[in-house]
Amino acid sequence: MKIIRGIHNIKEINSNSVVTIGNFDGIHLGHQKLFSHIYQIGQKYKLSTIVVLFEPQPLEFLRKNNAPVRITKFREKIRRISSYNFDSILCVKFNKSFQSLSAKDFIINILINKLHLKFIVIGNDFRFGFQRNGNINLLKKLGYKYQFNVIKIRPLYKNNIKISSTNIRKALSENNIKLASLLLGRVFSISGRVIHGNKIGRTMNYPTANILLSKNFLLTNGVYAVKIKYCPNKYAIGISNIGIKPSFSNTQKNKLLEVYLFDIKIDLYGKYIEIFIYKKIRDEQFFPSKKELKNQISQDILIVQKYFNIHKN
């Protein structure tokens, strides 16, 4: 699979293609259904399979700090899309120049002339191009003229809730991790590289692996039951604190994820790990002394161990 960074890096594609376009934030069940359609069409008609996504996501460019918070980092998004064995992922840089490109010009100049479009598979509420003027009607009109097929995937629902990135963000912001995971089709997780902390946990016999989070990270501050994937097919159960460590710092602005692993001692500094978040145990609290914090951590660990003993699968 090729990752094409920017329209200017598109090389000659020798075969016709089936394409989808979007942000695909979270790679939820709706995205997965769409990807399965692309793969099947590619196999059936011997077409190149191409996913077109935008980086940054359009609202991140347009709204800056007021943009919706990402569910999935770019690196994780690419990893999950790559698992479908598509031929190419085209990462389009969303900037002022691209923002002014009309939907019609994008379809003709990029999708048809460069990618040799024969099928396009889109979600139900898909819109694109200058002032979001590109929609299903424009695609069908141009499809008739330029001989490509348009396939619209209907939205999926779980428990009468539409599967969408917006609803997943809402669930996470309300600490409804169970619902978010249901809509994602997997346990909600975050990935990152382990950084050095201030080693306070180590002085209490609770050494932690730390990952820096953005200050507007979706989950609220608190203690969570987690599992981490630290090597291919290697997992460990642990307890995590998400927050700003109020007991020891009043200057930290960004959220930090600290995870203490049960029954395993391994140096994770510098490694890229994935943390699966299952349940919130309590809110983040201030403790006036290390002793009180240590006692609370001991209680938290018992709660998490009990949780995973009950939910072994």
UniProtKB/Swiss-Prot annotation:
GO terms for biological process: FAD biosynthetic process; FMN biosynthetic process; riboflavin biosynthetic process. It comes from the Bacteria. Its EC number is 2.7.1.26, 2.7.7.2. Pathway: Cofactor biosynthesis; FAD biosynthesis; FAD from FMN: step 1/1; Cofactor biosynthesis; FMN biosynthesis; FMN from riboflavin (ATP route): step 1/1. It catalyses: riboflavin + ATP = FMN + ADP + H(+); FMN + ATP + H(+) = FAD + diphosphate. Transmembrane segments: none annotated. GO terms for molecular function: ATP binding; FMN adenylyltransferase activity; riboflavin kinase activity. It is an enzyme of class 2 (transferase). CDD domains: FAD_synthetase_N (cd02064). NCBIfam families: PRK05627.1-2 (NF004159), PRK05627.1-5 (NF004162), PRK05627.1-6 (NF004163), ribF (TIGR00083). Belongs to the RibF family. Catalyzes the phosphorylation of riboflavin to FMN followed by the adenylation of FMN to FAD. This is Bifunctional riboflavin kinase/FMN adenylyltransferase. It comes from Buchnera aphidicola subsp. Acyrthosiphon pisum (strain APS) (Acyrthosiphon pisum symbiotic bacterium). The gene is ribF.
